Amino acid sequence: MFETNYWPFPDQAPNPFNAQVEQLSATENVYIFLTTLFGILQLVYVIFKLLCTMFPALHWSPIWRGLENFWLFLSLASLAIAYWWLPSMTFTGYWALTIIATILGLIMLIMMSVKFVSFVKLFYRTGSFAIAIRGPIVLVALDVTIKLHCTPFAILVKEVGNIFYLSEYCNKPLTAAQVAALRICVGGQWFAYTRSTTTSAAKVAAANSTAKYHLFVLQGVAEYTQLSSVKFE
């Protein structure tokens, strides 16, 4: 007799969904777990950002910033490890990757929307397009400047410093050399940005606190890498 592709007794046919799960290898299970973990961590990261937008005081908290960086590192690490298993994926793995990529795309849209709303608020408050667009650029430039002039170990020191930063350091006045060091890092734009975009004493204090926080990080990096371009008293 010829073999047929249909099952003669439907009630005895194997469940295709159960069969698919049973055929997954340990590698695929790890991959799906890691990609799912990445999606969950990214969702939590977006919640962090939204909370910082609604409650600006959280953005200036070094402990909060340290947790934010740690969460982002953990999510990216899970994705990197997942891609290490990419060559051994089957159709199920690609299906999971498609779902995670869709979630990530939605997250990016949410993040872009939050950034756009912040930009519009800053533009409305200052009335200057140049100031509104310069704010995020200055913050990114400061972080990139640190990373470009430091070793991987110094970058680790910077991230650890985000968590173990002493809040009372913000109450100390900046010296002339420290101000000069900050101007070197951001091309002299940092203090112009803080003066132009703050309208109250509380916001001025928060901006100065952030400047000193970045200075604290730079001091810690300089101690470990002997940066020649940054001099402190």
UniProtKB/Swiss-Prot annotation:
Domain of life: Viruses
Major site of localization recorded for this protein: virion
Membrane topology field: Multi-pass membrane protein
Transmembrane segments: 32-52, 70-90, 94-114
Gene Ontology terms for molecular function: structural constituent of virion
A family per Pfam: DUF2632
Keywords: Host Golgi apparatus, Host membrane, Membrane, Transmembrane, Transmembrane helix, Viral envelope protein, Viral matrix protein, Virion
Protein's cellular compartments: Virion membrane; Host Golgi apparatus membrane
Membrane side Intravirion: residue ranges: 53-69, 115-233
Virion surface topology ranges: 1-31, 91-93
Subunit structure: Interacts with many viral proteins in infected cells. Interacts with envelope E protein in the budding compartment of the host cell, which is located between endoplasmic reticulum and the Golgi complex. Forms a complex with HE and S proteins. Interacts with nucleocapsid N protein. This interaction probably participates in the viral mRNA packaging into the virus.
Function: Component of the viral envelope that plays a central role in virus morphogenesis and assembly via its interactions with other viral proteins.
Protein name as catalogued: Membrane protein
Source organism of the structure: Breda virus 1 (BRV-1)
Gene that produces this protein: M
